Amino acid sequence: MLRKCVGCGKIEDREKFVKITRDAHSNVFVNPNSKIFGRSVYLCYNKSCVEAAFKKNKIQKALKAPIPDELKGKLLNEF
C-alpha cells in the first residue's frame, strides 16, 4: 500500500516509512509494526523529513493531537 511522507511528500510503500499513531485516548506514539489502529502519519527514515515535519507542526496537525516532547526527542535522535 502506498503512503505519503508528511515531511517531504514522497510517496512510497508503507514499509519504507516510520508510522506515528494517535489512539482513541489521544496517546501519540511510534507504531513500528502497525498493530495498533488509529489516526496515523508516515515519515521517511531520515532526519531532514523529521525536522521538516516538526518545524511546520505537520504531525500535530495531521494527528489532531499534541505531540509529547519525549517523542520529538526520540525521533530526532533516532535518525
Task: Pin down the residues of each PLM region.
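Short functional micro-motifs and their immediate structural scaffolds
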Residues: 13-16, 49, 54
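C-terminal structural segments of small proteins and small subunits
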Residues: 51-79
